[in-house]
């Protein structure tokens, strides 16, 4: 860590902020998003710093790659959580049997979501994959503060926030030269396609909610 004293303090702060997150055993959705946004902001500020150097840029880039690897599985969990709760019950039986959402069929407006999930099922992040069907992804009540949201609204918000964060991160990575690596370039292009699909789904959902509330 001593070498960081000769680098831009913004990059040093960004790296340390994310190192704290990686040292935690159990990290909530809110903490990951906040730390990701802070790290991106600090690294962008470093571009204007006189102490900014190639070593600073390389360290920031490596940190972004680690964040990317953490956010992609989070997006998968958010999509799966949202999709699972949109799918109507398959049976009125009291016995609950878990079904992988990627194998379900989606009616009408939810067909886009089904397509996203099927595309995502073959996507592999830089991190070890977890089973998304067993995880729930939504903001905590502490983050929402005075705003009261039902379960579907909070899951919608989680998707929206993750999409925005990932899109900003992918853009930064591409600007820093991530496109030179063919494997990363392919993953980024595919992820951007998924983000566009999810954003379209969210916009359609917002329009539907507005009509219902009017």
Curated annotation (Swiss-Prot):
Residues 1-17 form the signal peptide. Keywords: Glycoprotein, Signal. Glycans are attached at residues 103, 204. Pathway: Secondary metabolite biosynthesis. Part of the cla gene cluster that produces clavatol and ortho-quinone methide. The clavatol biosynthesis cluster cla and the terrestric acid cluster tra are both involved in the production of peniphenones and penilactones. The non-reducing PKS claF is responsible for the formation of clavatol from successive condensations of 3 malonyl-CoA units, presumably with a simple acetyl-CoA starter unit, and 2 methylation steps. The esterase claE probably collaborates with claF by catalyzing the hydrolysis of ACP-bound acyl intermediates to free the ACP from stalled intermediates. This is Clavatol biosynthesis cluster protein B. The lineage of its organism: Eukaryota, Fungi, Dikarya, Ascomycota, Pezizomycotina.
């Amino acid at each position: 860590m001593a070498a960081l004293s000769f680098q831009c303090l913004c990059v040093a702060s960004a790296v340390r902020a994310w190192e704290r997150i990686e040292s935690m055993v159990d990290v909530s959705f809110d903490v990951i998003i906040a730390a990701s946004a802070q790290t991106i902001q600090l690294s962008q500020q470093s571009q204007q710093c006189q102490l900014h150097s190639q070593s600073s840029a390389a360290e920031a880039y490596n940190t972004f790659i680690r964040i990317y690897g953490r956010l992609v599985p989070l997006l998968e969990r958010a999509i799966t959580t949202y999709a699972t709760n949109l799918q109507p019950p398959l049976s009125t039986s009291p016995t609950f049997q878990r079904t992988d959402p990627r194998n379900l069929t989606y009616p009408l407006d939810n067909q886009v979501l089904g397509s996203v999930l099927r595309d995502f099922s073959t996507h592999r992040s830089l991190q070890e994959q977890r089973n998304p069907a067993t995880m729930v992804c939504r903001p905590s009540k502490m983050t929402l503060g005075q705003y009261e949201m039902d379960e579907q609204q909070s899951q919608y918000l989680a998707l929206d926030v993750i999409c925005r964060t990932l899109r900003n991160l992918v853009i930064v990575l591409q600007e820093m030269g991530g496109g030179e690596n063919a494997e990363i370039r392919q993953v980024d292009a595919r992820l951007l396609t998924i983000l566009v699909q999810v954003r379209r789904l969210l916009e359609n959902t917002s329009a539907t909610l507005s009509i219902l509330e009017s």
